[in-house]
Amino acid sequence: MNDSAHIDYARYDHIRPLLWTGDALELLDQRKLPFVVEHVRCDTSDAVAEAIHSLAVRGAPAIGIAAGWGVALAARDIAADDGNAALQKLEPALLRLNAARPTAVNLAWALMRMRRVLGAAGADWRAVIAREAQAIADEDLAANRHMGALGAALIAPGSGVLTHCNTGSLATAGFGTALGVIRAGMAQQRIAKVFAGETRPWLQGARLTVWELQQDGIDATLIADSAASHLMKSGLVQWVIVGADRICANGDTANKIGTYQLAIAARHHGVKFMVVAPSSTVDMATASGDQIEIEQRDPGELFGVGGVRTVADGIHAWNPVFDVTPGDLIDAIVTERGVIAQPDQARMQAAFGN
């Protein structure tokens, strides 16, 4: 029953946030959804970096894919006889792309992958870049579909689930990570009810996740972030399913701010907690969450909703974008390599140590 053949991808996988046209990267502008469906055209690597920083494109896998195409765009501005010479000239552009969002490891991973293939490329280095960028996108989509099947298999039929932020097609090459599990679970009739937290301050849950599910014909119920513990106490959800921006060697997981408190509440109420992310999100070089740089964004993002100020002048705000959930609060980490139950350093090493 967990076979991906049971999933109608024509229904559950038709949204695409990135489109490479051959001469530019078209990004579905996620700052304007759900009311305006508009694309941002990026024809330089710096335009891609700005789109990543400004959240026109967001989600750890999606920004890694965007960065790959950003390298392809940067390559147009230089001349080099081989990949190694090109890499030296491209390094400033790669550094600017990497600085756009510091917490998500997929961004650095994608750029390191581009460096590796460039360093070994000959005179055809431009074609090598384009092939590698496309491969990053193709592999992400395949991984998401596989993770969807693996994660759905953990869910008992009739379950309710709660998700946080946006981890669907908009955050990936397609189908999604945590939302991919939910899509697969709905397709297999394992999930009876979906709840989504609004995810302040950017409202990714309210603006993006419930919109995505609506496009698929999936009935989702939006809740205020502050209602999550009460929802768990009610018995309406059996799983919290989230994505990740970085998973450490001991299972500690950085994800959208608010994830940590969901994990604490889930453990208290006997609700299972699942993290879904491709292996590119796993950072075995980072021993624990204490070593993760947590991105801080403009405090002004907390001062209003939808462009309307709701806070008095002169108020200070603290606006971390991510938090770290300890591995011992996570029941399962799902990647395309398999399921790591009760993740700890030994289990993570066994799965990803090579």
Swiss-Prot record:
The keyword Cell cycle does not apply. It comes from the Bacteria. GO terms for molecular function: S-methyl-5-thioribose-1-phosphate isomerase activity. Pfam families: IF-2B. Keywords: Amino-acid biosynthesis, Isomerase, Methionine biosynthesis. The keyword Cell division does not apply. It catalyses: 5-(methylsulfanyl)-alpha-D-ribose 1-phosphate = 5-(methylsulfanyl)-D-ribulose 1-phosphate. The record marks C165 as: Transition state stabilizer. Substrate binds at R58, G59, A60, R101, Q204, N255, K256. Pathway: Amino-acid biosynthesis; L-methionine biosynthesis via salvage pathway; L-methionine from S-methyl-5-thio-alpha-D-ribose 1-phosphate: step 1/6. One of its GO terms (biological process) is L-methionine salvage from methylthioadenosine. Its EC number is 5.3.1.23. The active site is at D245. Belongs to the eIF-2B alpha/beta/delta subunits family. MtnA subfamily. Catalyzes the interconversion of methylthioribose-1-phosphate (MTR-1-P) into methylthioribulose-1-phosphate (MTRu-1-P). This is Methylthioribose-1-phosphate isomerase. It comes from Xanthomonas oryzae pv. oryzae (strain KACC10331 / KXO85).
